[in-house]
């Protein structure tokens, strides 16, 4: 079912499915991004830097969050206008992540009255419910009718 601006209210929470981050995911992101930093490719180096082993790229975790979120809702339009994140804790192979978003603002667009602007606070958490990534999204959402 498609969700429109009129269906969304401040305080509404949206939780995604869960997904395990694998070593293969990290390896694929190394190849895709070209980011071969040893924190992502070498367990020994990552341990010497104070981590439990190699860690996922922050942008990999953000990309996975985006994919999980896109499957959690069917918003009309749903185009990102702004996105900001803070990388809080490392994600290691075998960690299971999911995201919880809370709508903090809903308003009709002034320039496009057939659309609205929705602001969300987003937290991506691991299997221990520790926040690993958090921030804000601003998205454009279709409305059912004119203002």
Question: What is each stretch, according to the model?
Answer:
Residues 38-40, 79-80, 85-87, 117, ...:
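Short, intrinsically disordered/low-complexity patches at protein termini
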């Amino acid at each position: 079912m498609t969700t429109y601006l009129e269906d969304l209210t401040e305080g509404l929470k949206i939780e995604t499915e869960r997904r395990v981050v694998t070593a293969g995911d990290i390896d694929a992101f190394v190849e895709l991004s070209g980011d071969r930093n040893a924190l992502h490719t070498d367990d020994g180096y990552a341990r010497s830097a104070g981590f439990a082993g190699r860690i996922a790229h922050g942008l990999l975790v953000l990309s996975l969050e985006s994919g999980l979120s896109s499957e959690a809702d069917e918003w009309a339009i749903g185009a990102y206008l702004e996105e900001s994140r803070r990388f809080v804790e490392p994600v290691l192979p075998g960690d299971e992540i999911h995201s919880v978003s809370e709508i903090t603002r809903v308003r009709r667009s002034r320039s496009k009255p057939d659309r609205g602007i929705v602001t969300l606070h987003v937290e991506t958490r691991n299997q221990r419910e520790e926040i690993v990534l958090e921030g804000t999204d601003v998205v454009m959402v279709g409305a059912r009718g004119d203002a």
